[in-house]
Every structure is written in structure tokens, then in C-alpha cells.
Amino acid sequence: MRYFRLSEPISEKLKVTTSKWLWVAAIVCFSGCSSYYKHLVPGKGDVHCIEQFTPQYVSTMYSAYVDVTKHHFSGILFIKQMPDSSTRIVFANEIGVKFFDFSFSKEGEFTKNYILEKMDKKAVVLALRNDLKLVLLHPSLNNATVLTDNTNNFVAVPNKKGNDYYVTDKDCTRLVRIEKSSKRKPVVVAELMDYKNGIPDSVHIQHKNFKFS
């Protein structure tokens, strides 16, 4: 079974899951007005190399965990490519009760088909939309640039508040992580791991400084 996890920031303690897979996550601390990305310099490479990491979802199922403040949701996340090339994403518990049902058109337009009332808050819906769009990995690369820290390459895609960074190894053979950033620091970090037949076996999304409410 594939695994998908979305969590809010970790504050005082590390959050650990105890099953056959293990997540240990800690919040990253920043101080002053210095930028987490100030060490990046222009790099060499083709921004389009990240397209090879776009998940080839046709009809995929994940065992999913979503933590929203005091609420913990677990169940099955279905991702299905529809005949019109849109993508349908449904999160439900194991007896079929839906938590949310979203669609993304081929052009990336978002539709909220359904969401559970306790989750139906503007900030939560916006965060879920942005998170899922991030891991579907269909960025517009028209204004993208390649930066480097001399260890990894960062394909920087401008967004309204900063950049989405697609971090790869120097040769762009491995997707290290995806970061949605403000102008100074990452606010969301996504990891797509253990690709098999074009599909990540595990997906982990963590918010660094945002509390769902």
C-alpha cells in the first residue's frame, strides 16, 4: 500500500508514527530577516528536467493521514485520471465516508466537489488545494530558473508570495523535495519518494509555519 501524509507544524515535540513506515519531522527555525535561500546562486541545467518526476497517476490509491489542528483523519486517498484529462482526488475513510472530493482540470483549475463540514474552512481548502496541486507536479515553467547550492539544483517557479522550489540532485536524476516558499523561507515541504512505474510510493507534505483553523 502506498502512503500519503499531510501534517501541520510540529511545535514542542517530534511527531513519530509507529507502523511499518516511520516519519520523524521537526519544525525548521529561522531568525531575523535573513533569507533561507540567500546562499543560492545561478546554476546550469534545463528547468524542464523536473517534468520526468510528474506522477503518472491513472487510478492510484494511497493509505492517507491528514492532521488538521486537533483533528486527525485517516483513510484512503484515490487519485484518478478522468476521460477529459482532469484529475479527481477523493479522500474517504475505509467504509466509504468522504472527507473531501476535489478536481483539477487539465489546465490546473480547481473544483471543490465536496468537503466535510468540519474541514470546510477557507484556509483549509486553500491549503489542501495548493498542497495537492504541488504534488501533482504540473508547474508552469515559462519563468522558471535554475539555482544551485553546489549540492542540489533548485528549479525556482515564481508564485504570488515567493517561489515553488523543485529540488533535485545536480544531475536531475532524483527529486529531493518540493518547497513552497515565502520570500524568506519554506512554508510547505513535500517529499515524493520511492517512485515505482512513474508513481511515488510515499508522499509526505508538511506545513512549517501555518496552523489550519
Predicted regions, residues:
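Short, basic, low-complexity termini and linkers enriched in Ser/Thr/Gly/Pro
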Residues: 11-26
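Post-signal-peptide N-terminal segment of Sec-exported extracytoplasmic proteins
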Residues: 53-88
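C-terminal motif of bacterial Sec signal peptides marking the signal peptidase cleavage site
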Residues: 29-32
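Membrane-embedded segments
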Residues: 87-100, 104, 110
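Hydrophobic/aromatic beta-strand elements that line small-molecule binding cavities or substrate pockets
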Residues: 75-80, 102, 190-194
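Bacterial signal peptide processing site
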Residues: 34-37
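Gly/Pro-enriched, hydrophobic low-complexity segments
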Residues: 152-213
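Acidic/charged, solvent-exposed loop-and-adjacent secondary-structure segments enriched in E/D, K/R, S/T
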Residues: 110-142
